[in-house]
Amino acid sequence: MIVKRPVSASLARAFFYIVLLSILSTGIALLTLASSLRDAEAINIAGSLRMQSYRLGYDLQSGSPQLNAHRQLFQQALHSPVLTNLNVWYVPEAVKTRYAHLNANWLEMNNRLSKGDLPWYQANINNYVNQIDLFVLALQHYAERKMLLVVAISLAGGIGIFTLVFFTLRRIRHQVVAPLNQLVTASQRIEHGQFDSPPLDTNLPNELGLLAKTFNQMSSELHKLYRSLEASVEEKTRDLHEAKRRLEVLYQCSQALNTSQIDVHCFRHILQIVRDNEAAEYLELNVGENWRISEGQPNPELPMQILPVTMQETVYGELHWQNSHVSSSEPLLNSVSSMLGRGLYFNQAQKHFQQLLLMEERATIARELHDSLAQVLSYLRIQLTLLKRSIPEDNATAQSIMADFSQALNDAYRQLRELLTTFRLTLQQADLPSALREMLDTLQNQTSAKLTLDCRLPTLALDAQMQVHLLQIIREAVLNAMKHANASEIAVSCVTAPDGNHTVYIRDNGIGIGEPKEPEGHYGLNIMRERAERLGGTLTFSQPSGGGTLVSISFRSAEGEESQLM
């Protein structure tokens, strides 16, 4: 927009006219006053001509020797500069005419005075004095008119200045003050968030019109921006409320994991918290192939979302979920899946720690047995050897008793060594499949038979105590097959039934066994049965139709009801 009449130019023009009018009126008045400075002198000199005229008549009548001197004085007074300067263009004609008549008549009178013509002088002196009076009167009127002119010019200048000031102020009021007041009012309304003020007048041809147009555009843009910011603030507020709700959910989930023992109940509680707060239709945590817990019922009309449950790049399982608002639930469930991964990691860490405690305790027992019972058995073997040497060989009864005693002592020593080996079992893995693989790899070095493993038993179904008992049963069964079955292949398989029952099979392709009976003084099978009872299960021996031996351990974990397939 082009500014046609800028405020600065309009104000400058108005002030210029005011100053110009002031200068003109003041200048004319000053010039007029300057020209009046010697008016009084001119009037005085003109008035003195009357007295000098009478004095010349007296000198002429009395024959005074000063007549010529007085004539010269009159001549000087009549032609004084203050009177001769009256012959200018701005002096009224009446003044100049009167002055010209005085000069002309003075020539005649001066001539008569030089001739001494007293009668003529006396006859014309009064007329000449009257002319002087008229000249003085003309000078007086001229001076008065100049004063009136000064007054008139000053009055006209004052009226002109007042008029210019009035119109300037009026214009400033309409074109500057009023628009500025509107701008102030509109600014105050905008300050209070009110953008519905009437549009400002944009028709003004000055900067304020341009400012009003720009302000209207700014107000419109601010209105749009303000509404946009309000919408953004509302959105951010909703996001903050949503984030707060999610943090509360995550806090509740973290509190569910903040227990001394992380088990399946903790994971189910987490799924319940998420389902209650996120309104998810279905949640399912899968760990391995045979262990999962779920909340809700799956909806076939909704897609199943899957998130990996990981910790330190290790995948522990998957989190399946269904929700009608996938985008809003996904960030929370990502965090929940990470939390479940940490929970599974700490579950295995706790189990590993408990296993280490058990292993340390069993190693301590093994050391105590070795330091006590093993030393006693060794001492008995030495004493038995000495006793054999002291008994005659022809004493058959004593020799038979000594042979039985020696056999029993050897069996006790062998069983003690096996027991010490069992107590010194060390495993570095916390989850059941890895622990079984580690144990079988160790046994594989002791046999030519092929050891295979198929473990589908969920590690979360067992705590550390149960897992150690199960490992010991499997180890004892595999060792028995290695020693007595003459087998070329020994297979270990672990499965979980849909009802939550777990079964471990140790099968070999060896010679098979009949009724499982232990020789007198052997307790391996009894120990295996006792361990199975501690698992809350049963130990059975059978001969499959294909030959060999099948050892079965069936049990139900403490959380068996939680690990059913749902």
From Swiss-Prot:
UniProt keyword Cytoplasm, yes or no? no
Stretches in topological domain Periplasmic: 35-146
Where in the sequence is Phosphohistidine found? Answer: H370
Organism whose genome encodes this protein = Escherichia coli (strain K12)
> What lineage, starting at the top, does this entry show?
Bacteria, Pseudomonadati, Pseudomonadota, Gammaproteobacteria, Enterobacterales
Which residues are on the Cytoplasmic side of the membrane?
1-13, 168-566
Physiological role:
Acts as a sensor for nitrate/nitrite and transduces signal of nitrate/nitrite availability to the NarL/NarP proteins. NarQ probably activates NarL and NarP by phosphorylation. NarQ probably negatively regulates the NarL protein by dephosphorylation.
Q: Which NCBIfam families match?
A: PRK10935.1
The UniProt gene name for this protein comes to narQ
Q: Which GO terms describe its biological process?
A: cellular response to nitrate; cellular response to nitrite; nitrate assimilation; signal transduction
Looking up Pfam families in the UniProt record yields: HAMP, HATPase_c, HisKA_3, PilJ
* The protein, known as: Nitrate/nitrite sensor protein NarQ
So which residues are the signal peptide here? none
Q: Where is the HAMP domain?
A: 174-227
